[in-house]
Amino acid sequence: MEKRKIILDCDPGHDDAIAMMMAAKHPAIDLLGITIVAGNQTLDKTLINGLNVCQKLEINVPVYAGMPQPIMRQQIVADNIHGETGLDGPVFEPLTRQAESTHAVKYIIDTLMASDGDITLVPVGPLSNIAVAMRMQPAILPKIREIVLMGGAYGTGNFTPSAEFNIFADPEAARVVFTSGVPLVMMGLDLTNQTVCTPDVIARMERAGGPAGELFSDIMNFTLKTQFENYGLAGGPVHDATCIGYLINPDGIKTQEMYVEVDVNSGPCYGRTVCDELGVLGKPANTKVGITIDTDWFWGLVEECVRGYIKTH
């Protein structure tokens, strides 16, 4: 089995933590580094959350702090979903794990420039780090094997009627990424909302046990509450984890190639990913857009990763 080399760029975040857990443990993934961006909460909080998850699960991968602000727009956070810390719910031990001193954008550029073009970027938060890296060093573009991102929607948004949170948090950065010419795979809300984590799924992961089962339960019981209160959903979708699922086995997710453009004009559609599903614009497709996911396969994959953290000695 080929191991996919990835850099996970995230804003932890409840579903980010699940993506981290999967990426660090599955044998099909070679997690080179974790870069942190502001998004679900401010950078100081998302960084602490990422380090806490790494410490709890003994994920021995370097963590780098990145962009504290969007490129242009005023900063927003998703405290209605992720709480005051950005990862409300779990209680962690005192933090001793530290981030690297190198800035995340520099790490991304240096790692890609030294590579053979075999590294996939997996941004599951706002695209600020990725866009700034592209603008600072355009020579990285042909070095990126693929970008598999969580963001956008071809239907309804979740932060505005038009826009999904990750894209709305930094639409100008998203515009840079979607016009970069790099192969893109987009896991938008239309797909990720199919991964609603019900009480039955939480109980299943609790039964699987170990530190990851405990963390999964604490994380998803919190989002069960906030997702129902905000959106009436029967549980919290694990949006970001779908990107890791796709990288492990793309056959579990049906995609459709489309031309996707990010609306950066002020107004009700600011931050919308305009997906030309019918091809009416006649422009060449630039993105594989996730349509449906085999949820039985997906939750089996999550459980496999949860069980991977159980110590046998």
UniProtKB/Swiss-Prot annotation:
Cofactor note: Binds 1 Ca(2+) ion per monomer.
Binding residues for Ca(2+): 11, 16, 124, 240
Catalytic activity from the UniProt record: a pyrimidine ribonucleoside + H2O = a pyrimidine nucleobase + D-ribose
Record bears the keyword Metal-binding: yes
PROSITE patterns: IUNH
SUPFAM superfamilies to which the protein is assigned, alphabetical: Nucleoside hydrolase
Disulphide bridges, residue numbers: none
Keyword Chloroplast carried by entry: no
Gene Ontology molecular function terms on file: calcium ion binding; purine nucleosidase activity; uridine nucleosidase activity
Domain of life: Bacteria
Residues the record marks as active site: 11 (proton acceptor)
Cofactor: Ca(2+)
Residues the record lists as binding substrate: 227, 239
GO CC entries: cytosol
GO biological process: purine nucleoside catabolic process; pyrimidine nucleobase metabolic process; pyrimidine ribonucleoside catabolic process
Binding partners and assembly: Homotetramer.
NCBIfam families: PRK09955.1
Family listed: Belongs to the IUNH family. RihB subfamily.
Role: Hydrolyzes cytidine or uridine to ribose and cytosine or uracil, respectively. Has a clear preference for cytidine over uridine. Strictly specific for ribonucleosides.
Name of protein: Pyrimidine-specific ribonucleoside hydrolase RihB
